Design a protein with these regions (language model features):
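Active-site cofactor/substrate anionic-group-binding motifs, chiefly glycine-
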Residues: 1-25
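Short, contiguous, pocket-lining structural segments
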Residues: 4, 8, 31, 35, ...
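Short beta-strands and strand-loop turn motifs
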Residues: 24-27, 110
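Acidic, glycine-rich active-site loops and adjacent beta-strand->loop/helix elements
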Residues: 27-34, 144-145
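Active-site-proximal loop->helix
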Residues: 31-47
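Glycine-rich anion-binding loops and their surrounding alpha/beta cores
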Residues: 44, 49, 63-198
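Phosphate-binding loop that captures ATP/GTP phosphates
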Residues: 50-61
Length: 198
């Protein structure tokens, strides 16, 4: 996750669920090379939720509340067991890309995933992985790393993969999606956040 501006991805999940689409996020505690913000980091270190051993309890909460967060260590212990070797690897391993598209929990109906990439080229590997996944629809957008927040302050490319069909590409332009006043507020807010980073 990106640390220089507020992290809204964690709070987007209950909002999506409130809009009628059950949603969950999965993550582990931060890993190198960036040690960014993760759902698990917020749960454990901010909200004081027990880190592991409560996977079934979290799944029950998702079923009851239609949203929640899964600890990758509970869902995929073999992946969590690679933590020490991942800490020794300086560069970002291929696992960091693959683990975004894991499906530790499957919906009764159709399953969708929305994720982002920051560096160009990752959209190709993510949509190709999407073709081979169990997800019915994979949505990959150019935006902030580690979130489902597409770059509304600029034109964002979104790629939609439905099963084995050809990948569709869409452009999102905040200036065309929002009224002029709202678009101006988005641009001003983004500029203000950039000043905070400095």
């Amino acid at each position: 996750g990106f640390q220089r501006i507020p992290y809204f991805g964690f709070y987007a999940i209950p909002v999506i669920a409130e809009l009628g689409l059950p949603a969950y996020g999965h993550s582990a505690l931060p890993l190198p090379p960036k040690f960014g913000i993760t759902f698990e980091d917020l749960l454990v270190n901010h909200y004081q939720v027990a880190q592991s051993g409560n996977g079934e309890k979290r799944i029950k909460q998702i079923q009851d509340s239609h949203f929640g967060y899964i600890n990758t260590g509970d869902a995929l212990p073999a992946l969590e067991n690679l933590r020490s070797i991942r800490s020794e690897i300086v560069k970002r391993p291929m696992l960091a890309t693959l683990e975004k598209i894991l499906m530790p929990l499957q919906a009764d109906g159709q399953s969708f995933i929305a994720t982002t990439y920051f560096h160009r080229g990752y959209e190709v590997s993510l949509t190709e992985i999407g073709k081979r996944s169990q997800f019915d629809r994979v949505i990959v957008g150019n935006g902030m790393e580690g979130t489902t927040l597409f770059g509304v302050h600029k034109e964002a490319k979104v790629f939609i993969q439905d099963g084995n069909k050809e990948t569709q590409s869409r452009s999102l332009k905040y200036s065309e999606m929002f009224q002029e006043g709202t678009a101006k507020q988005i641009l001003e807010s983004h500029e203000a956040l950039k000043e905070i980073e400095s």
